[in-house]
Amino acid sequence: MSGRFITLEGGEGAGKSSNLVWLAEALRAEGKTVMVSREPGGTALAESIREVLLAPSNEVMADDTELLLVFAARAQHLEQKIRPALARGEWVLCDRFLDATWAYQGAGRGLDSAAIAALEALVIRDTRPDMTILFDVPVEVGMARAGKRAALDRIEQEDRAFFDRIRQCYLARAAQEPNRFRTVDASQPLESVQQQLARIVEEMQAWP
């Protein structure tokens, strides 16, 4: 029995993390065995890489270094956690995955798409999301929400133009792959967002 792989994507302040918990509980209520994880992270080694990636003290990090660290964390995450869970028939919910790399390192940093594609082929292979839920929010709203946090990490400290590029990349990818993406208006109040998610959960129940 094979499981299902669902990823949650979006810019800063989109509310992915809090709604990930709601979504996991909704699926468990339907009798699913759910594993929740995140990227970068998900394993002890990958979480250590996450700390390096996000530490404000590492502001001089080269963009290529950032890209390689992201894929190093992902390789460990896939091998140690995601693939075994899917093989057990579990539903894997992951806060960010490959689309985030195309948005942040590709569009945000302007890194070469051929380099990202080569690393994708090496690391991802055939482990692809069954569905990706995009939490879309205007950049100014997301930045205002993120700004309320105790301290901004290295990525959150980027400028408005950086996050504009990220949002446009996400929307473009959603338009290119409508069968995989479901876009949620994350600028709405939490109750409205969860109503949108409830409809997506209903759709998942129809999966064979």
From Swiss-Prot:
Reaction(s) the record says it catalyses: dTMP + ATP = dTDP + ADP
Entry annotated with the keyword Disulfide bond: no
EC number: 2.7.4.9
GO cellular component: cytosol
Biological processes annotated in GO: dTDP biosynthetic process; dTTP biosynthetic process; dUDP biosynthetic process
Gene3D superfamilies documented for this protein: P-loop containing nucleotide triphosphate hydrolases (3.40.50.300)
Keyword annotations: ATP-binding, Kinase, Nucleotide biosynthesis, Nucleotide-binding, Transferase
HAMAP family: Thymidylate_kinase
Protein name per UniProt: Thymidylate kinase
Organism: Alcanivorax borkumensis (strain ATCC 700651 / DSM 11573 / NCIMB 13689 / SK2)
